[in-house]
Each structure stands twice: as C-alpha cells, then as structure tokens.
C-alpha cells in the first residue's frame, strides 16, 4: 500500500498518491491517532470508489481536492476508463454532506479532450 502523506508548512497533512480512498480505514485510524496535533487533513481523490469508502472518513477530512478529467460523461469515460455515474454520484454526495467551500475540483487542460463548456457545471465549487 502506498499513501503519500505531505506535511504542509507544519499545519496539516494531505493524503494522496494513487487513490487514497481505497485505504479509508487506514486513513481514519491515522487521523484518530493524530487529531490532537491540530493539523488539518486534506484528501486528494478521483472519487472513483464505492460510496462507503467516502462515508467512512468524510467527517475526518477538513478539505477535499477532487481530480477529474472532464464533466462530459463520454469524454470522462473515454479518458479514465471509469464510471462517470459513480464519480458524479460521489461528487454530489460530497457536496451535499460537506459543502462546496470544503471542496476544490481540479481539471487539467487536456488538448483535444476538455473545454470550458464541458467543465462549467463545476462553477458552484472551486475549480482549479
């Protein structure tokens, strides 16, 4: 299991590398052990996991960075080979549960794949 944990100016930790939500039980136990540090905990995720993995740690995480390739179903599935419906369902759940102010969505510019039009649906959340 590889989970990269980065110290950000001694103020918090970021869980990333691969898909950290595959290890949500580990992350939850880790956070329990270090809650008294005062650190903020951030999770980088593609949300391409079962909802239960998100439910397991959603209240332990202070901030979410969501990576996606596009908000168009066909383009998303072509590029990621994953389920757009699963991603979208998890994103909606995250928005409803923690609110847009705790979520940042990153969409890389991929030539010949995505356009502003295909990602403008994300305007209610911070788009980077």
Role assignments for model-derived ranges:
Residues 2-128:
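Conserved AdoMet/S-adenosylmethionine-binding subsite of the radical SAM
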